[in-house]
């Protein structure tokens, strides 16, 4: 589905694909990311403004001409904004992606299985989506690295932070 064709509205309504942000402050924060990027030279390909549905709804936004001095480059957005970056080499884009204090989730697209494993392992993020934008489900461990947290929620790993593991090795039991 093309980003322009996304249906904005009540997240519980049939056919709606983009719901509201949790609060007006959250929406204002996302808009501040967009405004910062545009003021520093980014281009809005689509979206970039509040939706007609209200102050908690932001149109899905694609930004190009994004540079490293923009907030969208370094910070977690938590809104429907996709900043697109240009790069020349795999090593360059990995360095760019990891050059942030945050590390919750990242996404990339590739058909090359070798590249998928190389890049996926090199990215410093708790969750990596490859050729997929919907990366959360009840079976997947959810959590980040760096300033995006430690530990995982959900999945079979969700209880690990609450457990103390003890190893007991016995010998000399021959009577």
Label the model's feature ranges.
Residues 4-32, 49-57, 74-79, 138-146:
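Flexible, acidic loop-helix segments that line cofactor/substrate-binding pockets
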Residues 40-41, 54:
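Generic structural motif recognizing short loop/turn segments at the entrances and edges of beta-strands
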Residues 50, 57-175:
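Conserved C-terminal structural/oligomerization subdomain of aldehyde/semialdehyde dehydrogenase
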Residues 6-10, 41, 166:
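A general structural signal marking secondary-structure boundaries and capping sites
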Residues 41-48:
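Short secondary-structure junctions
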């Amino acid at each position: 589905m093309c980003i322009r064709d996304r249906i904005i509205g009540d997240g519980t309504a049939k056919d709606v694909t983009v719901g509201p942000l949790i609060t007006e402050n959250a929406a204002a924060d996302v808009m501040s990311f967009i405004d910062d990027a545009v003021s520093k030279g980014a281009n809005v390909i689509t979206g970039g403004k509040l939706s007609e549905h209200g102050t908690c709804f932001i149109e899905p936004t694609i930004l190009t001409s994004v540079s490293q001095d923009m907030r969208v480059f370094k910070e977690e957005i938590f809104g429907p904004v996709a900043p697109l970056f240009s790069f020349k080499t795999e090593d360059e884009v990995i360095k760019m992606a990891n050059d942030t204090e945050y590390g919750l989730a990242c996404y990339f697209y590739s058909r090359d299985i070798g590249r998928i494993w190389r890049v996926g392992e090199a990215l410093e993020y708790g969750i990596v989506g490859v050729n997929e934008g919907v990366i959360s489900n009840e079976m997947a461990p959810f959590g980040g690295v760096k300033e995006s947290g430690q530990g995982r929620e959900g999945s079979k790993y969700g209880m690990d932070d609450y457990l103390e593991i003890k190893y007991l090795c016995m010998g000399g039991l021959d009577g």
